[in-house]
Amino acid sequence: MASSVLSSAAVATRSNVAQANMVAPFTGLKSAASFPVSRKQNLDITSIASNGGRVQCMQVWPPINKKKYETLSYLPDLSVEQLLSEIEYLLKNGWVPCLEFETEHGFVYREHHKSPGYYDGRYWTMWKLPMFGCTDATQVLAEVEEAKKAYPQAWIRIIGFDNVRQVQCISFIAYKPEGY
């Protein structure tokens, strides 16, 4: 009798260890453990396929008639106040404002180079010289208005150049021609 009790205890211990090591199947990014469950759990992993729960809200960018110009170019055009705010941010960081314009291709295209990336075939023309020593955002906005008068069918962007590290730190579209 003692041997049967011992063997049944050993078997019971082994089954508890096996149950403790079992891992629930992955059901996406949402954890069901934190919510009370009022229905019976279905442990059949073939019926609980999921793409991750939170992924349901993602959408595909429509490529037709949606040209990409710069970072955040999918947002509506910036108002004058928003432009001034961006320019003040640029100046506050010590970057040199510079205006550039493009009369033909304001969007990404591949003409001379086929690989994607920063060198995407766009070479913009600089408007005058970089505005070294500029401390007023309205001066930059006045230059944008002057460039708009000179080239009304051009895309105009403002870039912030860090002359210490010699890199472009910010770039955004300040003006797009009608119809874009």
From Swiss-Prot:
GO MF annotations in UniProt: ribulose-bisphosphate carboxylase activity
Cellular compartments per GO CC: chloroplast; plasmodesma; viral replication complex
Main location: plastid
The entry's keywords: Antiviral defense, Calvin cycle, Carbon dioxide fixation, Cell junction, Chloroplast, Photorespiration, Photosynthesis, Plastid, Transit peptide
GO biological process: defense response to virus; photorespiration; reductive pentose-phosphate cycle
Highest taxon, organism lineage: Eukaryota
Localization per Swiss-Prot or TrEMBL: Plastid, Chloroplast; Cell junction, Plasmodesma
Keyword ATP-binding among UniProt keywords: no
Phenotype of the disrupted gene, per the record: In susceptible plants, increased tomato mosaic tobamovirus (ToMV) induced necrosis in inoculated leaves but delayed development of systemic viral symptoms. ToMV is able to establish efficient local infection but not to move systemically. Compromised Tm-2(2)-dependent resistance.
Gene3D superfamilies recorded: Ribulose bisphosphate carboxylase, small subunit
Transit peptide: 1-56
SUPFAM superfamilies referenced in this protein's UniProt entry, alphabetically: RuBisCO, small subunit
Note: The basic functional RuBisCO is composed of a large chain homodimer in a 'head-to-tail' conformation. In form I RuBisCO this homodimer is arranged in a barrel-like tetramer with the small subunits forming a tetrameric 'cap' on each end of the 'barrel'.
HAMAP family in alphabetical order: RuBisCO_S_bact (MF_00859)
Subunit (UniProt): Heterohexadecamer of 8 large and 8 small subunits.
Family note: Belongs to the RuBisCO small chain family.
Function: RuBisCO catalyzes two reactions: the carboxylation of D-ribulose 1,5-bisphosphate, the primary event in carbon dioxide fixation, as well as the oxidative fragmentation of the pentose substrate. Both reactions occur simultaneously and in competition at the same active site. Although the small subunit is not catalytic it is essential for maximal activity. Involved in antiviral defenses.
Protein name according to UniProt: Ribulose bisphosphate carboxylase small subunit, chloroplastic
